[in-house]
Amino acid sequence: MSTITVNGTEVWLQGQGDEVILMLHGWPDTRALWDGTVAALQDRATCARLTLPGFESGPSVTSLDDMCQLLRQIVDRISPDHPVTLMLHDWGCMFGYEFAMRHPDRVARVVAVDVGDHNSGALLRSWGFKEKLSVFGYQVWLALAWKLGGSLGTRMTRAMARWLRCPSDAGRITHKMNYPYAMQWFGTAGGLKHAAPVDLPMPLLFVYGERKPFMFHSVRWLEKVAAQPGSAVQGLPCGHWVMISRPEAFHARVRSWLWGEM
């Protein structure tokens, strides 16, 4: 393994092969989310991963524009001559989608896990009152925990992580990881209202957990992705953390889509 630092963010590089896969996690995770995935793919690709700025160290919040700029700097360092493959989960999907749409020349294809058209009217309409209340409840709770900060904010965050059955190491979870929710609900650091609707110009493999109280994609968007040449969708019988709950099936599907392995 080798390590580089880009604008204060440490990036780990593991594996071999000309293809570079940049992995972005979400809440309440770190680059450790991808440990098993790196082990499963590093024989065919160079896997690059980072912990999102602010989740453990760095600025308390990173705006959408600054995040896209950082990702551009990272991609230009790790693969200056060829576009990369993005592998995304949770908030990593939101940030990664935006980067891919702003810089389509730097992204060859995308593997996204469990978050699809996050800002679409179709998704909002697909949620009933109970689903909307659930989403509002946990996300605003986490946004408030970030705002409060300190030990109280961290206790609130860990309590929500337990309630949501997050597989992450609870001892590493802090309120610092919640700033995307503050961006979403409080408009912190410019907010997320200017994020573009998710419409990727490159092939997409979208893998999602089928056993959740609500989905983070609309059926309409799923059908649109499935109909695009080169793209595919795959549901697996699990919750939000697909790569943890169903690692063998997830990694087999990814390898099949990326490299045609059966």
Question: Predicted regions span which residues?
Answer:
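Conserved HGGG/HGGXW glycine-rich cap/lid loop of the alpha/beta-hydrolase fold
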Residues: 13-57
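The conserved beta1-alpha1 loop
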Residues: 22-26, 89, 208-209
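A short loop-to-beta-strand scaffold at the N-terminal edge of the catalytic core in hydrolase folds
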Residues: 5-14
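Glycine-rich phosphate-binding loop signature in dinucleotide/nucleotide-binding domains
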Residues: 15-16, 75-82, 257, 261
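Post-His helix in hydrolase/transferase enzymes
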Residues: 244-258
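Hydrophobic residues on the short alpha-helix immediately C-terminal to a glycine-rich phosphate/catalytic loop
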Residues: 37, 99, 253-257
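Flexible "cap/lid" subdomain of the alpha/beta-hydrolase fold that forms the substrate-access gate
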Residues: 33, 48, 53-85, 94-234, ...
